[in-house]
Amino acid sequence: LSRVAQYANRELSIGLREITPEQATQYLEIRSEEVGQKTLDMERQAIQAMMHFTSKKLNQDERLAVIKSEHQQILKSRSYTPEQLNIITESQRPQNALSTQLAHAAGLRGHELFTLRRIEERGVSDRPALAEKFQGREGERYTVQGKGGLIREVRIPTHLANQLEAQRLPEPKHVTDRTINYIQHYKISAGRAWAASFSRASEKKLGGSEGAHGVRHSYAQERMYELQNSGINRDKALEIVSQEMGHFRPDITETYLR
Protein backbone atom coordinates (compact mmCIF):
# COMPACT_ATOMS: atom_id res chain seq x y z
CA LEU A 1 0.00 0.00 0.00
CA SER A 2 3.03 2.29 0.08
CA ARG A 3 2.43 3.44 -3.51
CA VAL A 4 -1.20 4.27 -2.71
CA ALA A 5 -0.06 6.20 0.37
CA GLN A 6 2.40 8.19 -1.74
CA TYR A 7 -0.37 9.01 -4.23
CA ALA A 8 -2.75 10.09 -1.44
CA ASN A 9 -0.09 12.32 0.09
CA ARG A 10 1.23 13.80 -3.17
CA GLU A 11 -1.99 14.24 -5.15
CA LEU A 12 -4.68 14.52 -2.49
CA SER A 13 -2.74 15.89 0.52
CA ILE A 14 -4.29 13.26 2.80
CA GLY A 15 -3.15 10.13 4.61
CA LEU A 16 -3.75 6.59 3.38
CA ARG A 17 -6.57 5.91 5.84
CA GLU A 18 -8.43 9.04 4.71
CA ILE A 19 -8.71 7.97 1.07
CA THR A 20 -12.32 7.41 -0.06
CA PRO A 21 -13.58 4.63 -2.36
CA GLU A 22 -14.02 7.23 -5.14
CA GLN A 23 -10.43 8.43 -4.73
CA ALA A 24 -9.20 4.84 -4.66
CA THR A 25 -10.97 4.17 -7.95
CA GLN A 26 -9.34 7.26 -9.46
CA TYR A 27 -5.94 5.95 -8.35
CA LEU A 28 -6.63 2.53 -9.91
CA GLU A 29 -7.74 4.17 -13.17
CA ILE A 30 -4.41 6.00 -13.37
CA ARG A 31 -2.48 2.82 -12.53
CA SER A 32 -4.36 0.92 -15.26
CA GLU A 33 -2.04 2.46 -17.87
CA GLU A 34 1.09 1.55 -15.91
CA VAL A 35 0.63 -2.07 -14.77
CA GLY A 36 -0.95 -5.34 -15.89
CA GLN A 37 -4.27 -6.78 -14.71
CA LYS A 38 -2.75 -9.04 -12.04
CA THR A 39 -0.90 -6.19 -10.31
CA LEU A 40 -3.91 -3.89 -10.64
CA ASP A 41 -6.20 -6.50 -9.06
CA MET A 42 -3.74 -7.08 -6.20
CA GLU A 43 -3.60 -3.35 -5.46
CA ARG A 44 -7.41 -3.09 -5.59
CA GLN A 45 -7.76 -6.02 -3.17
CA ALA A 46 -5.19 -4.53 -0.77
CA ILE A 47 -6.97 -1.16 -0.74
CA GLN A 48 -10.31 -2.91 -0.32
CA ALA A 49 -9.05 -4.93 2.67
CA MET A 50 -7.67 -1.76 4.27
CA MET A 51 -11.06 -0.07 3.80
CA HIS A 52 -12.89 -3.07 5.28
CA PHE A 53 -10.73 -3.62 8.35
CA THR A 54 -8.75 -0.45 9.08
CA SER A 55 -10.28 2.76 7.75
CA LYS A 56 -13.84 1.36 7.64
CA LYS A 57 -14.52 3.35 4.46
CA LEU A 58 -16.31 0.31 2.99
CA ASN A 59 -18.96 -1.89 4.56
CA GLN A 60 -18.14 -5.61 4.58
CA ASP A 61 -20.55 -6.27 1.70
CA GLU A 62 -19.16 -3.42 -0.46
CA ARG A 63 -16.44 -3.80 -3.08
CA LEU A 64 -14.26 -1.44 -5.12
CA ALA A 65 -15.04 -1.39 -8.82
CA VAL A 66 -12.91 -3.73 -10.94
CA ILE A 67 -10.80 -1.60 -13.30
CA LYS A 68 -9.51 -3.06 -16.56
CA SER A 69 -5.78 -2.65 -17.23
CA GLU A 70 -4.86 -0.88 -20.46
CA HIS A 71 -1.14 -1.58 -20.07
CA GLN A 72 -1.02 -4.51 -22.52
CA GLN A 73 -3.17 -2.57 -24.99
CA ILE A 74 -0.66 0.28 -24.92
CA LEU A 75 2.26 -2.11 -25.36
CA LYS A 76 0.63 -4.00 -28.24
CA SER A 77 -0.83 -1.08 -30.19
CA ARG A 78 1.16 0.59 -32.94
CA SER A 79 0.75 3.93 -34.66
CA TYR A 80 -1.02 4.69 -37.92
CA THR A 81 0.35 7.04 -40.56
CA PRO A 82 -1.78 10.08 -41.53
CA GLU A 83 -2.40 8.39 -44.90
CA GLN A 84 -3.70 5.24 -43.21
CA LEU A 85 -5.97 7.28 -40.96
CA ASN A 86 -7.37 9.09 -44.00
CA ILE A 87 -8.17 5.73 -45.59
CA ILE A 88 -9.93 4.63 -42.39
CA THR A 89 -12.01 7.80 -42.00
CA GLU A 90 -13.10 7.68 -45.64
CA SER A 91 -14.77 4.33 -45.00
CA GLN A 92 -16.41 5.36 -41.70
CA ARG A 93 -19.78 7.00 -41.24
CA PRO A 94 -19.46 10.79 -40.71
CA GLN A 95 -20.03 10.61 -36.93
CA ASN A 96 -17.33 7.97 -36.51
CA ALA A 97 -14.97 9.66 -38.98
CA LEU A 98 -15.15 12.96 -37.08
CA SER A 99 -14.34 11.15 -33.83
CA THR A 100 -11.32 9.49 -35.43
CA GLN A 101 -10.08 12.87 -36.65
CA LEU A 102 -10.62 14.45 -33.22
CA ALA A 103 -8.88 11.59 -31.40
CA HIS A 104 -5.91 11.81 -33.77
CA ALA A 105 -5.66 15.61 -33.64
CA ALA A 106 -5.76 15.79 -29.84
CA GLY A 107 -4.41 12.40 -28.72
CA LEU A 108 -7.68 11.34 -27.08
CA ARG A 109 -8.68 8.07 -25.47
CA GLY A 110 -11.95 6.64 -26.81
CA HIS A 111 -13.94 7.44 -23.67
CA GLU A 112 -12.60 11.01 -23.58
CA LEU A 113 -14.60 11.78 -26.72
CA PHE A 114 -17.71 11.60 -24.53
CA THR A 115 -16.34 14.35 -22.30
CA LEU A 116 -15.33 17.09 -24.75
CA ARG A 117 -16.19 20.62 -23.54
CA ARG A 118 -15.04 24.10 -24.54
CA ILE A 119 -12.46 25.36 -22.06
CA GLU A 120 -14.61 28.31 -20.94
CA GLU A 121 -17.28 25.82 -19.83
CA ARG A 122 -15.05 23.88 -17.43
CA GLY A 123 -11.77 24.51 -15.64
CA VAL A 124 -8.77 22.20 -15.85
CA SER A 125 -7.20 20.21 -13.00
CA ASP A 126 -4.18 21.67 -11.25
CA ARG A 127 -1.28 19.86 -12.91
CA PRO A 128 2.21 20.86 -14.15
CA ALA A 129 2.26 22.58 -17.55
CA LEU A 130 5.42 23.53 -19.40
CA ALA A 131 5.38 26.74 -21.44
CA GLU A 132 5.99 24.73 -24.62
CA LYS A 133 2.82 22.69 -24.21
CA PHE A 134 0.97 22.67 -27.58
CA GLN A 135 3.86 24.55 -29.19
CA GLY A 136 3.38 24.48 -32.96
CA ARG A 137 -0.28 23.43 -32.71
CA GLU A 138 -2.86 26.05 -33.62
CA GLY A 139 -6.54 25.59 -32.87
CA GLU A 140 -9.33 25.89 -30.34
CA ARG A 141 -9.07 25.16 -26.63
CA TYR A 142 -11.19 22.32 -25.25
CA THR A 143 -11.09 20.07 -22.20
CA VAL A 144 -11.61 16.36 -21.66
CA GLN A 145 -11.93 14.28 -18.51
CA GLY A 146 -9.42 11.46 -18.51
CA LYS A 147 -8.07 8.80 -16.19
CA GLY A 148 -8.72 9.35 -12.50
CA GLY A 149 -11.15 12.19 -13.21
CA LEU A 150 -8.31 14.44 -14.40
CA ILE A 151 -9.56 17.34 -16.54
CA ARG A 152 -6.94 18.53 -19.01
CA GLU A 153 -6.78 20.98 -21.88
CA VAL A 154 -6.57 19.68 -25.45
CA ARG A 155 -6.06 21.60 -28.67
CA ILE A 156 -8.37 20.96 -31.65
CA PRO A 157 -7.75 22.37 -35.15
CA THR A 158 -10.28 25.08 -36.00
CA HIS A 159 -11.82 23.22 -38.95
CA LEU A 160 -12.51 20.19 -36.73
CA ALA A 161 -13.77 22.39 -33.89
CA ASN A 162 -16.28 23.93 -36.31
CA GLN A 163 -17.50 20.46 -37.29
CA LEU A 164 -17.70 19.49 -33.62
CA GLU A 165 -19.75 22.58 -32.70
CA ALA A 166 -22.17 21.76 -35.52
CA GLN A 167 -22.91 18.55 -33.57
CA ARG A 168 -23.59 20.28 -30.24
CA LEU A 169 -26.63 18.75 -28.54
CA PRO A 170 -29.52 21.06 -27.55
CA GLU A 171 -29.27 19.53 -24.06
CA PRO A 172 -26.50 17.36 -22.59
CA LYS A 173 -27.40 13.67 -22.41
CA HIS A 174 -26.43 10.88 -20.03
CA VAL A 175 -24.76 7.88 -21.65
CA THR A 176 -23.26 4.67 -20.26
CA ASP A 177 -20.25 2.97 -21.81
CA ARG A 178 -18.52 -0.08 -20.30
CA THR A 179 -20.63 0.44 -17.13
CA ILE A 180 -19.32 4.01 -16.68
CA ASN A 181 -21.68 7.00 -16.86
CA TYR A 182 -20.86 10.12 -18.88
CA ILE A 183 -22.55 13.41 -19.72
CA GLN A 184 -22.19 14.02 -23.45
CA HIS A 185 -22.46 17.48 -25.05
CA TYR A 186 -21.91 16.59 -28.72
CA LYS A 187 -23.57 14.12 -31.05
CA ILE A 188 -20.41 12.20 -31.94
CA SER A 189 -19.32 8.58 -31.63
CA ALA A 190 -17.18 7.64 -28.62
CA GLY A 191 -16.08 4.79 -26.41
CA ARG A 192 -16.79 1.22 -27.41
CA ALA A 193 -18.94 2.07 -30.46
CA TRP A 194 -16.25 4.31 -31.96
CA ALA A 195 -13.46 1.81 -31.22
CA ALA A 196 -15.44 -0.97 -32.93
CA SER A 197 -16.09 1.24 -35.96
CA PHE A 198 -12.40 2.12 -36.17
CA SER A 199 -11.27 -1.52 -36.01
CA ARG A 200 -13.82 -2.61 -38.63
CA ALA A 201 -12.71 0.13 -41.02
CA SER A 202 -9.04 -0.66 -40.44
CA GLU A 203 -9.53 -4.38 -41.05
CA LYS A 204 -11.60 -3.73 -44.17
CA LYS A 205 -9.31 -1.16 -45.78
CA LEU A 206 -5.86 -2.01 -44.39
CA GLY A 207 -6.21 -5.75 -43.86
CA GLY A 208 -5.78 -5.58 -40.09
CA SER A 209 -6.20 -3.37 -37.04
CA GLU A 210 -3.86 -2.03 -34.39
CA GLY A 211 -6.92 -0.92 -32.41
CA ALA A 212 -8.28 2.57 -31.84
CA HIS A 213 -5.57 3.12 -29.21
CA GLY A 214 -3.14 3.29 -32.13
CA VAL A 215 -4.43 6.81 -32.77
CA ARG A 216 -2.85 7.94 -29.49
CA HIS A 217 0.41 6.34 -30.57
CA SER A 218 0.22 8.38 -33.78
CA TYR A 219 -0.33 11.59 -31.81
CA ALA A 220 2.61 10.88 -29.49
CA GLN A 221 5.00 10.12 -32.33
CA GLU A 222 3.94 13.11 -34.42
CA ARG A 223 4.26 15.49 -31.47
CA MET A 224 7.68 14.13 -30.53
CA TYR A 225 8.85 14.77 -34.10
CA GLU A 226 7.36 18.29 -34.15
CA LEU A 227 8.81 19.30 -30.80
CA GLN A 228 12.28 17.90 -31.42
CA ASN A 229 12.29 19.41 -34.91
CA SER A 230 11.67 22.82 -33.31
CA GLY A 231 14.82 22.46 -31.20
CA ILE A 232 13.44 20.99 -27.96
CA ASN A 233 15.57 18.18 -26.50
CA ARG A 234 14.15 14.67 -26.29
CA ASP A 235 13.66 14.49 -22.50
CA LYS A 236 11.74 17.76 -22.43
CA ALA A 237 9.66 16.70 -25.46
CA LEU A 238 8.73 13.47 -23.65
CA GLU A 239 7.53 15.52 -20.67
CA ILE A 240 5.52 17.91 -22.86
CA VAL A 241 3.79 15.05 -24.68
CA SER A 242 3.03 13.32 -21.37
CA GLN A 243 1.25 16.50 -20.23
CA GLU A 244 -0.67 16.87 -23.49
CA MET A 245 -1.82 13.22 -23.37
CA GLY A 246 -2.81 13.32 -19.71
CA HIS A 247 -0.59 10.69 -18.10
CA PHE A 248 2.16 13.11 -16.91
CA ARG A 249 4.77 10.33 -17.03
CA PRO A 250 7.55 10.66 -19.63
CA ASP A 251 8.30 6.94 -19.26
CA ILE A 252 4.75 6.11 -20.38
CA THR A 253 5.23 8.39 -23.38
CA GLU A 254 8.18 6.15 -24.28
CA THR A 255 5.84 3.15 -24.65
CA TYR A 256 3.85 5.08 -27.27
CA LEU A 257 6.96 5.53 -29.41
CA ARG A 258 7.49 1.83 -30.22
Kindly give the residue locations of the regions a language model identified.
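Active-site/catalytic core of tyrosine-dependent DNA strand-transfer enzymes
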Residues: 155-221
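DNA breakage-rejoining catalytic core of tyrosine-based enzymes
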Residues: 70-87, 148-158, 175
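N-terminal core-binding DNA-recognition domain of tyrosine recombinases/integrases
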Residues: 1-76
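Short basic/aromatic active-site micro-motif
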Residues: 207-228, 234-243, 247
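Conserved tyrosine-mediated DNA breakage-rejoining catalytic core shared by Y-recombinases
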Residues: 116-162
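The alpha-helix within a helix-turn-helix
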Residues: 103, 114, 242-243
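Basic, Lys/Arg- and aromatic-enriched nucleic-acid-binding interface segment
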Residues: 82-111
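Catalytic-site neighborhood detector that most strongly recognizes the C-terminal catalytic loop/helix
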Residues: 243-258
